[in-house]
Each structure stands twice: as C-alpha cells, then as structure tokens.
C-alpha cells in the first residue's frame, strides 16, 4: 500500500524540521532537461555547435560507468543534476532565503533507494558556494531501521503531508522510477512547450518505449508549432530507451 504520508510523519517524528518530496525536484529536472534538449536541437538546426543525441540518466552508477568505459560519449550526457541534488541546491538557496536561514546551518538529507547516491553527493560538481547540495544520503533500508530503532509504530502513523512549496509534483515526476519514465516525462514537457498541446498519446502514455524487453524506440513528429519554435516545424524527434 502507499505509505508516502506515513513516511512524511515518521521523518518529522525523527526530528527533521522540514520534509520535502523529491518528486518536486523530478519535475524541475524534466524542465531543465527539456529546455537543454531544445537548445541543442536548435543549435544543430541553425548551424551552431551542438552534440546529439542527448543521453540522460539520474543514476550516478550509470554515469560513473560511462566515465570509465565510454569517456568519448561524455559530451552526449545531459548536464542536469539528478532530482535529489537539485532539491538540495534549491533548499540551500531559494528556500534558505525564503525562510531566512543561513544555508551553512542547514543539513540536507536525501532518502534514496541506491547506495550509489552516497557517492554522488561527494562529487565536486555537487557543491555550490563551497557547500554540498546534499549533506548525507540514507537508503530506504537505513530509514526503516531508524524508524524501528526509534520505536515508531509506523503502521498506525497518521497520514502526514510534505512541507510546501517543495512538496508539490505532477504525474511526470511519478513515472521517473519506471523504465522509460524519464524519457516519457521529457517528451510530455517538450511537446507541450513547443506546440502548446498535450502529447498525442492516450493518457500521455508513450506505449512504444514502455517495458523491459530490449531497446525500445519511438518517433514523434512535431507539427503546428508555436511561433517561437517554428524551427522545429516538421521535425521528427527520435527517442530510445
């Protein structure tokens, strides 16, 4: 069963002052990746310097794999940070200013499903103004142990809510953890930004790139663009997962 609300309550009971939803930052990631994609495509179509295709992954383990084994492909990687490191950067800038706290006094903790996220926050790129975006990462298993050790009766906790405004998110963020989800979310964002219309798939679900079997691909033709994006009129966007 869905226990998101109980997790928010448990984290508050453990002593965290504010509890945010990484899905908010997943939406931010999609906006950043979508606009980066558009800028690269525009450069390629207008004779500028551009590297395509653009490759995206929020997995620090996968990024490290590319760095070690395929360094010649690094220019193809999206420059966007992963959602939880974006969240840390926003918390220590926008949110710190909003609530009037020195970011040096903040300690940001991410709850993540993968131990590679612990390594990720140590990377020099994950710092701003001499401060780490995220100070610590705990895995979901470690969080479960913390809740148990604290004697919290998780099953009977009331449904809590994330603190605002960094607790809101869309369906695009929800599918981030699904195979092909990041690509589908990016397509939704880019298509609507360029045309002013929703992606022409049933329930915005891009069936050709869904599933675990092999490499999946899809082609989406962009037509009737908004004036600002007329350079994309008739362009076919090809994606693969």
Where are these regions (language model features)?
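Iron-sulfur-associated redox domains of electron-transfer enzymes in respiratory
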Residues: 1-241
């Amino acid at each position: 069963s869905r226990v998101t609300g109980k997790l928010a309550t448990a984290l508050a009971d453990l002593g965290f002052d504010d509890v945010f939803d990484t899905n908010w930052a997943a939406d931010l990631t999609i906006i950043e990746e979508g606009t980066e994609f558009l800028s690269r495509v525009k450069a390629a179509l207008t004779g500028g310097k551009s590297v395509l295709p653009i490759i995206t992954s929020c997995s620090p383990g996968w990024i490290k794999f590319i760095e070690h084994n395929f360094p010649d492909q690094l220019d193809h990687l999206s420059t966007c940070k992963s959602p939880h490191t974006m969240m840390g950067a926003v918390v220590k800038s926008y949110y710190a200013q909003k609530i009037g706290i020195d970011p040096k006094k903040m300690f940001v903790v991410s709850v993540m499903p993968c131990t590679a996220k612990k390594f990720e926050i140590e990377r020099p790129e994950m710092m701003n103004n001499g401060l780490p975006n995220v100070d610590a990462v705990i895995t979901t298993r470690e969080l479960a142990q913390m809740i148990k050790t604290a004697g919290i009766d998780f099953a009977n906790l009331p449904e809590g809510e994330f603190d605002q405004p960094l607790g809101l998110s869309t369906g695009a963020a929800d599918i981030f953890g699904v195979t092909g989800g990041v690509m589908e979310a990016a397509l939704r964002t880019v298509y609507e930004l360029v045309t002013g219309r929703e992606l022409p798939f049933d329930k915005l679900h891009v069936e050709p790139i869904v599933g675990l079997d092999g490499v999946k691909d899809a082609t989406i033709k962009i037509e009737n663009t908004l004036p600002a994006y007329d350079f994309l009129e008739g362009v076919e966007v090809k994606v693969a997962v």
